[in-house]
Amino acid sequence: MVVLGLEDGVVEDICKEAQSKGKQIYAANYNCDGQIVVAGLKPDLSEFEALFKERGAKRAMLLNMSVASHCPLLKNASLELGELLESALNENFAPVISNVSAKPYTSKSEALNLLKEQLIKPVLYKQSIANSQDSVDCFVEFGASVLAGLNKKITPKPTYAISSLAEAKEFLKVVK
């Protein structure tokens, strides 16, 4: 469910309130100020949709998702992912910003822990961009420009959205 127009703390409080009643609802993606995705069991999300609106959300809308990502419902998948990553990763890393901590990591052990946690913890997207903006000249998104739109609300740094090989080649000419 995407919730628009509420502060992070209000969304978190509603999730805690739901959890205290045995419901499985979790803040899952902190996209930008006033936009949080909430994950959980669909019946639980549906039950609390109206409460988000009552507490001031401009919009609370169920998303067509096949899995409740970035929340404790994926605990078993997280453990399985850890086992697969153990043999897939090596020790050589360029710094990568973790969506779990919004900070860089550079080692295999950090990668293993943080990538497993990424399945069961919220995505700190806006915090990741805010924390990294001073060390980059621009951001590059490969895809449909969803993140470029969010970045406009988070940082003054430009974000380039690349959705084709031709766009990638053109971008590389410009940045050389």
Spans of model-derived segments:
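Acyltransferase/transacylase module recognition
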Residues: 89-176
